[in-house]
């Protein structure tokens, strides 16, 4: 549905916002693009509907070469791409009905067709009873629902969400995400969602990529990335070790024989550790554990300290891997993290 190849963006002042971006979003995907402020996320999503122009690269949406379109053709194609923003962008002098109708007026819909379409959209987002309300009379969540209805007005195939929940409280965020998920399923939309909130990715997305310093540093299914984040930025964003685990590990004098065991999908609820203990006659201390509920399933984490010979431990770990479980040696991982931090300190001093 959406395909970007070798996309670069350099501004006239020389600032490089995007570096060789390759990204593909399939029909029906909810792709979460996450990163810290200034990473290039918003530039990337604005290139998809050409609110920003790339310096180089190719961009296709629904098989159409977006960069080869003239202005009138671009306007027609943009009707297939809905977009919602952090700050709603509603017209204060228009009521809810007229804010949604505005998108249809711009697209030159027949006047007789506008009312039934707006009524349909307001029912979809749960605002039928507030059609005559003005933006000043709405809560933040209600304003975003109006913005969603407006973005869907022209039957788009793609929905772009630029920090759509970052101005909302936690409860309202959950309701908006539930609405977006329901709409995506009903309409079969492809959704690209920009956020710095990992909870948003966990709640709604099936795919994700991590952007840092203008480049995609990690990508994959949400379950894969949450289970085994590889890049240091990803680990920071998803809190690779929850606070309780980090606290426990920081107080361990010796990380030898300490492993993180990651269970995904159906494995999250199987008694594999107890089976392993019986099968291989090993003693194990469970230092911490948790289960993350994702939009596509669950990911469970246990931090285990083995009290066993190296041979028994290795056989037990091999058996766990054969059951579909991922294993991470925290001793080795902490050593690698220390090396990265040391390199960063050396580089910063050199600068």
From Swiss-Prot:
Subcellular compartments: Cell inner membrane
A family per Pfam: NIL
Catalytic activity: L-methionine(out) + ATP + H2O = L-methionine(in) + ADP + phosphate + H(+); D-methionine(out) + ATP + H2O = D-methionine(in) + ADP + phosphate + H(+)
InterPro entries according to UniProt: AAA+_ATPase (IPR003593), ABC_transporter-like_ATP-bd (IPR003439), ABC_transporter-like_CS (IPR017871), ACT-like_dom_sf (IPR045865), MetN_ABC (IPR041701), MetN_ABC_transporter-like (IPR050086), NIL_domain (IPR018449), P-loop_NTPase (IPR027417)
The keyword Transferase is assigned to this record: no
Assembly notes: The complex is composed of two ATP-binding proteins (MetN), two transmembrane proteins (MetI) and a solute-binding protein (MetQ).
Annotated protein name in UniProt: Methionine import ATP-binding protein MetN
